[in-house]
Swiss-Prot record:
Protein name per UniProt: Co-chaperonin GroES
One Gene Ontology molecular-function label: unfolded protein binding
UniProt xrefs under CDD domains: cpn10
Keywords linked to the UniProt accession: Chaperone, Cytoplasm
Cystine residue pairs: none
Gene giving rise to this polypeptide: groES
Its job: Together with the chaperonin GroEL, plays an essential role in assisting protein folding. The GroEL-GroES system forms a nano-cage that allows encapsulation of the non-native substrate proteins and provides a physical environment optimized to promote and accelerate protein folding. GroES binds to the apical surface of the GroEL ring, thereby capping the opening of the GroEL channel.
PANTHER family cross-referenced by the UniProt entry: 10 KDA HEAT SHOCK PROTEIN, CO-CHAPERONIN GROES
InterPro entries: Chaperonin_GroES, Chaperonin_GroES_sf, GroES-like_sf
């Protein structure tokens, strides 16, 4: 993947959502909400606080979905990042 975000943006790969409940009930794809956390895949040169491979939590309606190398990613403004998961 060769993508460099511009401005104050980062590229995030959403973390896999849970496909079953704790009691074993399978959740269909159309009933699942997209996860609000992911792993940072690329960072613009203007961002210092977030690094590649950091796990971040972001706002529900933030970002733009894109597809690179048959993988789905989210381009987020840094203001939409709520925090780094440690």
């Amino acid at each position: 993947m060769n993508f460099q975000p511009l401005g104050k943006r980062i590229l995030v790969k959403r973390l896999e959502e849970m496909k079953t409940t704790a009691s074993g009930i399978i959740i269909p794809d159309n009933a699942k909400e997209k996860p609000l956390n992911g792993e940072v895949a690329a960072v613009s040169k203007e961002i210092e606080d977030v690094k590649v491979n950091d796990k971040v939590m972001f706002a529900k309606y933030g970002g733009t979905e894109i597809k690179l190398d048959n993988e789905e990613y989210l381009v987020l403004n840094i203001e939409d990042v709520l925090g780094i998961i440690k």
